């Protein structure tokens, strides 16, 4: 079946251009021109992917993304005019999976869309493979790969599917450094590692939710999971 893609863009020329490219890929495109109607459209369409402009009338792209993702996990690719918005988009819990800065080439947009759809399929494989996996128990922080639940001091922490898979991938090898390339390959199923900023922004999101010491940066190499210190 063709994969439904929701395009949220208030600039008609761009919206049409994106929708045409998506249709040319054999996917189904549906266009919404403001944040509020995007939230409604997501409920009826149940898209496999959302392409969302950050600057929208009625409700901005970040708020719309939060609401869409809260209702049903779906990868969101944010379109932004400023490159420095990456952390705001991904790193502060709006729930987006990736972002692109305007102007961008349609070819690059479609490549990112394909990567995110692979990420959806990858997540299903990861979930299937984790069905019988034991708890990753680090005392105050517990990760349940089978149920896909993370708790800190007994309280559940809401993570996006990508954040969860990134955390679990790091936590399976505590204190070991994993390169960005390795993480992109394991979590995103990307082989060309052009999206290192994406990994960085997701790490920021995890630190934001779980505390800054949870993931250590090894400069020029990658990241390592640091189990919480055991308190006596």
Report the location of each language-model feature.
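N-terminal/domain-start alpha-helical segments
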Residues: 1-124
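Short, Lys/Arg-enriched segments at the junction into DNA-binding effector domains
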Residues: 3-4, 115-177
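Residues at or immediately flanking beta-strands
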Residues: 4, 28, 75, 135, ...
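Short amphipathic alpha-helical/adjacent loop interface patches that line ligand
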Residues: 26, 110-113, 145, 187, ...
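Positively charged, aromatic-enriched patches within helix-turn-helix-type DNA-binding elements
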Residues: 96, 149-214, 219-221, 227
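C-terminal end segment of the histidine kinase catalytic
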Residues: 124, 230-232
